[in-house]
Amino acid sequence: MAELLMDGIEKKYDGGSFAIKNFDLQIKDKEFVVFVGPSGCGKSTVLRMIAGLEKATAGSIYIDGKVLDKKMAANGDIAMVFQNYALYPHMSVYDNIAYSMKIKKVPKRQIKENVEKVADMLGLKEVLKRKPGQLSGGQKQRVAIGKALIRTPKVFLMDEPLSNLDAKLRTQMRMEIKELYKHSDATFVYVTHDQTEAMTLGTKIVVLNNGKIQQASTPKELYNKPANLFVAQFIGTPQMNVWKAKVVQEKKNVMLFIGGLGRYRLSEKNAELLRKRGYFDKEVYVGIRPEDIFLQVKGMDDEMFQSSLAARLKVYELDGAVSYLHLETAGESDSIENEKISSNENVAKNWNDTIESENKFNSNVTIRIEGNGDFREGEEYHFGFDESKIHFFDIETEKAIR
C-alpha cells in the first residue's frame, strides 16, 4: 500500500519567488498520477520533494499516514527514474541494475535472480554485459527503469523519462510503461510537459500552472469538462478554439456575437445556462474543440444556416484519415453574417470593433473532420457547433461557467 497526501505544500526560493504554493493533493494507492504543465510550472519540483531531493518550505508530505523522511527513500520505498537516465557509464547493464542490492549486501544468488527477472520483463537480457555507451536511447531508459524497479518500491517516480527519445521510441516506451504499471503494486507519479503522454498513461492527471493546481481529474473529465480556460487550451491538439463573445437577447432567441465571425443562435439549454448564471448582455469566452465544429451547406437547414458563422479557408491540411481546416476572419466589409444582422445591427458592429481591438484571442478557426474533401483555400465556409460540446468561461476569473 502507498497512499500519498500533500498537505499545504509550498516551495519558496531565497529570492522570494514561489515554485509551489497552496498545494493540496491526495494520490490513492496504485494510482498512476501524471503532473503536466508548461515549463517552469513546478511539476518537477513537486516530484523532487516527494523523492526527498528538495525540502518543502511549508506543509507536509505523507506516505501511508507517515510523514515523509529520508529513511523512506533510503529503504527503497521510493524510487525515481530521471530524464537523463543516471546510469554509471563504467558499469555493465547488469551491475547498474544490481547496484542498490549490492550496496545492501544482498546474497549474490538473490541478486542474480532479481536482475534476470527485471531484465526479462524489460527486454534487456541480451544486453546485460554491455555498458551504457553501447546502448540505444530506449535501452538506456529501460535500464534506468530497471534500476528503480529492482528495489520493489512503494512509490515509483518518473521525471520526463521519455523526453530524450524520438517519436517512435516514445510511443513504444509509453506502452511498456503502461504494461509495467499494470503488473506492479506500486503507486506511479509521472512528470511530463507532453499532454499525449499524460492523457494516455495517467489514471489521474494534475494540470499545473504557476505553481498551482489548475485541475486534478481523470483524462476524460479533464478533456470534456475543463475547470478553466487554461486547462481547456492546454489539453487537446489542436487546442480548443476560443473567442470573446457577447450574449444578447434578440426577440425570442439568444445570440452570441463573436467579433469577426458573426452571430450564432444558442440552443435553449445553453441560453438558459447563461441566463441563470447572469451573463445576458455580458461578455464571455466561448470555447469549442476542432472536432466539435461541423460545416454547413446552404439548403440543408436554411434557418440554421442563417445563424451560422463564416470564415475563409486559409490552410487545408490532410493528415491521413483526418483533415484540418484553418480558417480566418473574412473581414467586416465582405462578411456574409455582418450583412445579415438586422435588429441588433449597431450592437453587432460595435461589438465587432471592440473585439477586434482588444481580444486576446484571434477570430481564426480550426476544424477537424474525418476523411478529406474538395476544400479550396480562399473560399468562405459556414460552420456550426455541436452545442452539447460548447464551453463558456467567465471573462474575469476564466473559470468554466456551469
Placement of each model-derived feature along the sequence:
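A short, flexible loop at the N-terminus of ABC-type nucleotide-binding domains that lies
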Residues: 1-6, 10-22, 70-72, 105
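ABC ATPase nucleotide-binding domain
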Residues: 5, 26, 62, 382-384
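The feature captures the beta-strand-to-loop junction immediately N-terminal to the Walker
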Residues: 36-38
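Helix-to-loop junction immediately C-terminal to a conserved catalytic motif
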Residues: 51
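Conserved coupling/switch loops of ABC nucleotide-binding domains, chiefly the family-specific signature
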Residues: 57-60, 110, 210, 390
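Conserved ABC transporter NBD signature motif
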Residues: 59-67
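ABC ATPase nucleotide-binding domains
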Residues: 73-235
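Non-catalytic connector elements of ABC transporters
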Residues: 250-402
